[in-house]
Amino acid sequence: MVRIISLLFASIVFFSFIESKSTPYVVVLGIAQDGGAPHAACTKECCIHKWDNPQLHNQVSSIGIVDPLTNEVWIIDATPDFSVQLNTLTMEQKRVFKGVFLTHAHIGHYTGLIHLGREVMGAKEIPVYAMPKMEIFLTNNGPWSQLIELNNIDIKSLKNNTSVSLNDNLSITPFLVPHRDEFSETVGYKIQGPNKSLIFIPDIDKWEKWNINIQDMVHENDFSLLDGTFYDINELPGRDMSKIPHPFIVETFKVLEKVKNKSSVHFIHLNHTNPALNTSSNATKEIRKNGFNVAKRNQKFNL
């Protein structure tokens, strides 16, 4: 009887291991705001110690989607750190790069597309998924229009709240969020796997400006990567914070105060001034004390 139980336990462990190796997942490729950290021209304490130590650099906010079964990968947002992030995601081209999903037309989220052009990769019809205004922006403005003309990229049109099937295991759905939409609309994404789902909202103005209840969305999904650009209103002395609206992390504490799955929330898209970039800071401790987390580069979320 003991032998049977032991064999049964060993079988469960074995098949759980096999399943974990084949489960699709999201991987964090960067957690910083558009300019990364250290930030251009920044000589403040938040940056000065990072310049000479590449290991302390925080790459720009981006996530990858990986399906180990099919060996396929997709990237959400083409950042200024695209070359490094693509290399990480594809494991030095050992995985098949299937496309880019864009959130909006701010510099940290689409300018990495330039690496797909003939000056660098000379890519062949890489699918780039974009909302209508984003598609118009890329089509009508160089150098992005050249990527289309030379067939480096193949624009795939997205629609609000309309799911896109990536393969038999994965789907992705864009949803509009309020943001400074100078050149395009802004979206977040829901990524659905065989077992779990994740939402990614790197940029939004304020939660109360959205016609969707963020409490419900967090509750309904297994993981949430949310805009954590600024910790609080005191972060940029001398700047009018109303001109660069984001939900302060301390505001999100209150908004999600009654949510039961707080630990599923991971803040991302942190400005170079954000003390939460420092894992031992009081801000980071306060985030954890309130039941939340800060996303980490290379962190994986099984779907």
Q: How would you label these PLM feature ranges?
A:
Residues 195-197, 204-300:
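Cap/insert and terminal regions of metallo-dependent hydrolase folds
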Residues 66-129, 222:
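Active-site metal-binding motif and surrounding structural segment of the metallo-beta-lactamase
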Residues 21-89, 155-216, 300-303:
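Core dinuclear metal-dependent hydrolase active-site scaffold
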Residues 12-23:
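Bacterial Sec-dependent signal peptides at the C-terminal "C-region" and cleavage site
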Residues 35-37, 106-112, 137, 180-181, ...:
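Active-site environment of divalent metal-dependent phosphoester hydrolases
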Residues 4-13:
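Sec-dependent N-terminal signal peptides
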Residues 101, 126-135, 225, 266-268:
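Short internal beta-strands
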Residues 122-124, 134-157, 273-274:
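Active-site neighborhood of divalent metal-dependent phosphoester bond hydrolases
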